[in-house]
From Swiss-Prot:
The active site is at residue 79. InterPro entries: ADH-like_C, ADH-like_N, GroES-like_sf, Mito_Enoyl-ACP_Reductase, NAD(P)-bd_dom_sf, PKS_ER. Homodimer and heterodimer with ETR2. It comes from the Eukaryota. Belongs to the zinc-containing alcohol dehydrogenase family. Quinone oxidoreductase subfamily. GO terms for biological process: fatty acid biosynthetic process; fatty acid metabolic process. Changing residue 79 to N: 0.1% of catalytic activity. This is Enoyl-[acyl-carrier-protein] reductase 1, mitochondrial.
Length: 386
């Protein structure tokens, strides 16, 4: 369990030998008890002393932080990884900060900090950071540096990161990339992966990354009135083939998929499951011998059910994938993966999943903006910007 960043709670005005100086007044969204976000969140003001930084300390201001399903689950108390509660924000009762993903700008560094400087963009280096806030105080190793747009331009890159790309870089793109590269060796130009949830954020990243790595892919999506339009958009992103859930579950359609795979001279080696239920059974059946299915979500709330014959006669393997667990003790892997995603963004080769952005301008309590984000999350990913 990671502890939250330190907070410097002191009077707003401090007397020095010859003058008064002001403090940074910050705000954070907290909760003292688990429950529904609409019931338990509140905004807490706290102060950061920017004139008395320890040598390794860094002050950052928030540029943007999204509302993720895992954030909601943490507040509800049903997520395995939870932030520690603390009185460091100035609360009477111990309280936990909300949010795991976010993009920050460095505004001041301590005397021993050489890896960061004012103006740098950073993201948290570990989970349970507490990103639903206006500012944070931490040590330099609490952050991973990303290139800001000016730095990308100075390095000759055609594109700089957007706030949305930076604020949402550490979960969905990394999940897609690591599932495709960390477990199974897919032969470029030949081998296939199949995924359900093809229109989800991770699904779209997987289609794009698969194309960039020259992997063939099949994306499974639900039937819908504008099916042809959605299929065309997913193929434009990078999906080799797109099928419906009915086709995924149809034994009659199976030979068509086998023919696709046969024509490439490869095998279907990997399945990515975020749905469960019949959908997961269907994509598991498409794999060749020794195939692996990674489950990283369960949107249908139905159990993953695999026929016994797949285990016995095809040596099928089913495993879970949790990007938090994989990366929590492996900063090097996280950094190298981030660098690849950043390079694709800078080169214009990867399109980010768009968010619905809401600007925090101080006219509404901060926690209410995130409560609105939770309530509206079914309409798309919500991003609070500053």
């Amino acid at each position: 369990m990671y502890s939250v960043l330190k907070q410097s709670i002191r009077p707003r005005l401090l007397a020095t030998h010859n003058q008064f100086r002001t403090m940074i007044t910050a705000q954070a969204v907290l909760y003292t008890q688990h429950g529904e976000p609409k019931d338990v969140l509140f905004t807490q003001s706290f102060e950061i002393d920017d004139d008395n930084l320890a040598p390794n300390e860094v002050i950052v201001k928030t540029l943007g932080s999204p509302v993720n399903p895992s954030d909601i689950n943490q507040i509800q108390g049903v997520y395995p990884s939870k932030p520690a509660k603390t009185t460091g924000f100035g609360t009477t009762e111990p309280a936990a900060p909300c949010g795991n993903e976010g993009l920050f700008e460095v505004i001041k560094v301590g005397s021993n900090v050489s890896s960061l400087e004012a103006g740098d963009w950073v993201i948290p280096s570990h989970v349970n950071f507490g990103t639903w806030r206006t500012h944070a105080l931490g040590n330099d190793d609490d952050f991973i540096k990303l290139p800001n747009p000016a730095q990308s331009k100075a390095n000759g890159k055609p594109n700089g990161l957007t706030i949305n790309q930076g604020a949402t870089i550490s979960v969905n793109p990394l999940t897609a990339y690591l599932m495709l590269t960390h477990y199974v060796k897919l032969t470029p130009g030949k081998d296939w992966f199949i995924q359900n949830g093809g229109t989800s954020a991770v699904g779209k990243y997987a289609s794009q990354i698969g194309k960039l790595l020259n992997f063939n892919s099949i994306s499974v999506i639900r039937d819908r009135p504008n099916l042809d339009e959605v299929v065309a958009s997913l193929k434009e992103l990078g999906a080799t083939q797109v099928i419906t859930e009915d086709q995924n579950n149809s034994r009659e359609f199976g030979p068509t998929i086998k023919e696709w795979i046969k024509q490439s001279g490869g095998e279907a080696k990997l399945a990515l499951n975020c749905v469960g239920g019949k959908s997961s059974t269907g994509i598991a059946r498409k794999l060749n011998n020794n195939g692996l299915m990674l489950t990283y979500g369960g949107m249908s709330f139905q159990p993953v059910t695999i026929p016994t014959s797949l285990y016995i006669f095809k040596n099928f393997t089913s495993a879970g994938f949790w990007v938090t667990e994989l990366l929590k003790n492996n900063k090097e892997l996280k950094t190298s993966t981030l660098n690849q995603i950043i390079a694709w963004y800078e080169e214009g080769k990867l399109t980010d999943a768009k968010s619905i952005e809401t600007l925090y301008d101080g006219t509404k309590p901060l926690h209410e903006l995130y409560q609105d984000g939770v309530a509206n999350s079914k309409d798309g990913k919500q991003l609070i910007t500053y």
